[in-house]
């Protein structure tokens, strides 16, 4: 009997020591991605340097994996084909739901704690307030975009307008920069997009302000956030978080990366901050 007990203890010790028992999930290659809210070349320009930085900081291979649409980032994280994604607020809510509450938000830009959408129209269109959109053609970005669809739709509904009933036509451009170009070209009368993308388009002279400008800006809300799959090794999650938090705008490399993401600082995420996004999605009938 004593021999059997000793054998049981030995087997238990071996099982606990086995790399298969409660093994931390540390992938050979950390696969990062981002919602495709801008054109593919721009996304590669932004995120490839982040992959290089994380490779050095984490001392492991990190690869940026582009995707074709917003849904692919959600499904990719759920299927463990992606390890970390730069989500918009709405897609982060979808990812948390799709992974049964396990996806974990890590860090966001300080601007994302109080993000905004801008509504744009052609000067001389007669559109000055949300109520003027009635009977007009309008462009959102992607269906799954927080700043390009969900929150603009939410504030339109609060203004007692229903886009699908009160607008002449609703279209989806698929990306923030595309929305701006659609309005500028006259393809649609008005549209809504991410305020940081709008500022970048203005600064880089990608839009002509004599042909398109902002007529309304939303109140602030929580938006973009780096999110990992929940079963990723906790120590690795902490190292990823530290790598972003240590980026210093006074340091040349830190400034280069932070400028790519149009921020000066990352801050830790608090899951409670996205409850409002989830409630807005339910109110807009985009989540059940």
Segments (PLM) and residue ranges:
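Hydrophobic/proline-rich hinge and linker segments of small-molecule sensing/allosteric domains
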Residues: 106-129, 226-229
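Short helices/loops that flank or line small-molecule/ion binding pockets
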Residues: 71-85, 98-99, 131, 175-196
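Extracytoplasmic small-molecule ligand-binding "clamshell" domains
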Residues: 25-91
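Sec/Tat signal peptide C-region and signal peptidase I cleavage site
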Residues: 19-23
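Bacterial N-terminal signal peptides that target proteins for export
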Residues: 1-9
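Pocket-lining segment of extracytoplasmic ligand-binding domains
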Residues: 125, 136-235
């Amino acid at each position: 009997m004593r021999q059997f007990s000793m054998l049981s203890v030995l087997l238990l010790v071996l099982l606990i020591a086995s790399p298969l028992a409660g093994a931390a999930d540390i992938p050979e290659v950390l696969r990062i991605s981002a919602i495709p809210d801008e054109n593919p070349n721009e996304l590669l320009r932004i995120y490839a340097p982040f992959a290089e930085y994380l490779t050095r900081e984490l001392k492991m291979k990190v690869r940026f994996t582009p995707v074709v649409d917003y849904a692919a980032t959600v499904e990719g994280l759920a299927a463990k084909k992606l390890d970390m994604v730069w989500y918009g607020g709405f897609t982060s809510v979808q990812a948390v739901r799709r992974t049964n509450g396990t996806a974990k938000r890590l860090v966001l830009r300080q601007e994302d704690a109080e993000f905004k959408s801008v509504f744009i129209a052609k000067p001389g269109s007669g559109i000055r307030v949300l109520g003027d959109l009635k009977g007009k053609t309008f462009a959102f970005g992607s269906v799954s975009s927080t700043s390009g669809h969900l929150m603009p739709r939410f504030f339109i509904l609060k203004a007692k307008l229903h886009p699908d009933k009160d607008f002449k036509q609703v279209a989806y451009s698929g990306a923030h920069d595309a929305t701006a170009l659609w309005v500028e070209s006259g393809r649609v009368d008005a549209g809504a997009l991410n305020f940081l993308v709008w500022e970048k388009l203005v600064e880089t002279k990608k839009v002509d302000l004599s042909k398109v400008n902002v007529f309304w800006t939303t109140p602030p809300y929580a938006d973009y956030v780096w999110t990992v799959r929940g079963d990723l090794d906790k120590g690795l999650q902490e190292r990823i978080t530290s790598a972003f938090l240590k980026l210093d705008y006074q340091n040349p490399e830190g400034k280069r990366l932070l400028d790519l993401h149009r921020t000066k600082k990352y801050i830790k995420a608090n899951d409670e901050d996205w409850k409002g996004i989830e409630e807005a999605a339910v109110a807009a009938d985009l989540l059940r």
